[in-house]
Regions:
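N-terminal Rossmann-like NAD(P)+-binding subdomain of aldehyde/semialdehyde dehydrogenases
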Residues: 1-125
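Conserved NAD(P)+-binding/catalytic subdomain of aldehyde/semialdehyde dehydrogenases
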Residues: 180-267
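A glycine- and small/hydrophobic-rich beta-loop-beta segment
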Residues: 262, 270-283
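Conserved small/polar residues in nucleotide/adenosyl-binding loops
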Residues: 281-287, 304
């Protein structure tokens, strides 16, 4: 963790360097993703399976082994604890209640000329949800993307999520079942985005792709936009916290780590108005970081 003061001689230059926008697209990344998409478009399931074996070291021999739906998906609900199920259920209820307030009804009017004008709001038929599954897994992403779609009336939600070495996270798939996901395919990366956008023998194409992912996923979403809709192109996580002495430093440290843990490119910045605030936060961060490293061992090498 870097720490510097306004009294430092190079303070302004260091702040500018720290907060500078990311550079333009990496041409090697763009080319690699383009090639992956082209392979999936032309060879379908076979390309998807080969990329999954190569990048995720998944032992599957057919795409059908990567698909969970119906009773096979619901079975994961029994693999989580009572406390985990209660937490997912409560979060789902709160998310659903919020998004129900956003529903836009159809309306129509007849103007002075007798013309009928109006708006009809129709849900998409099929939406694809990308859920990260590399360095960490996020059941929250499942809930926050699936539930709005279901509230809107989307008939079919398919979720893709990488499972390195074939290790499925029961909590993520249980969240998918409880949220109403219709099908889960345990593939990830640009190849998963390509499969959602163009379809394969086993995966029907979707109308829109949502959800966060790494830079390969973000670039793939950028390249398939136009063929399908996307929510946005998410960059590395960033957070900027102002510690003005009115907030518990423990919460500041937790907020910083909540974004820094996403990946090694994440950026967490804290501006403190007093030495006391920054000193306490500086002491708390390593403790929280150690807890995070216990939960995510691979995180140690990238963030310490």
């Amino acid at each position: 963790m870097q720490r510097f003061s306004q009294s430092d001689g190079e303070f302004e230059a260091r702040v500018c360097a720290l907060t500078a926008p990311m550079e333009a697209l990496d041409p090697n990344l763009v080319s690699s993703v383009r090639d992956i998409i082209a392979e999936v478009r032309s060879r379908g399931d076979q390309a998807l399976l080969e990329f999954t074996q190569r990048f995720d070291q998944h032992p599957a021999e057919s795409v059908s082994e990567l698909v969970f739906e119906g009773d096979a998906l619901k079975a994961f609900e029994s693999q989580i604890t009572v406390a985990e199920r209660a937490a997912i259920t409560e979060a789902a209820q709160r998310i659903r209640r919020y998004h129900e307030e956003q529903i836009t009804p159809d309306w129509s009017i007849t103007d002075e000329h007798g013309s009928q004008l109006g708006q009809r709001v129709s849900p998409m038929q099929r939406v694809g949800l990308y859920v990260p599954g590399g360095k960490a897994s996020y059941p929250s992403s499942v809930l926050m993307n699936t539930i709005p779609a279901k509230v809107a009336g989307v008939a079919d939600v398919v979720m893709v999520a990488p499972t390195p070495s074939g290790q499925v996270n029961p909590l993520v798939l249980a969240a998918a079942s409880l949220a109403g996901v219709d099908q889960v395919v345990t593939v990830g990366g640009a190849q998963a985005v390509a499969a959602l956008a163009y379809g394969t023998e086993s995966i029907r194409a979707v109308d829109k792709i949502v959800g966060p992912g790494n830079r390969y996923v973000a670039e793939a979403k950028r390249q398939v936009f136009g063929k399908v809709g996307i929510d946005m192109i998410a960059g590395p996580s960033e957070i900027f916290v102002i510690a003005d002495g009115t907030v518990d430093p423990d919460w500041i440290a937790l907020d910083l780590m909540s974004q820094a843990e996403h990946d090694e490119m994440a950026q967490a910045v804290c501006i403190a108005t007093s030495e006391d605030s920054v000193s306490y936060t500086h002491l708390t961060l390593p403790l929280i970081g150690q807890l995070l490293i216990l939960a995510l061992p691979d995180f140690a090498e990238t963030r310490q």
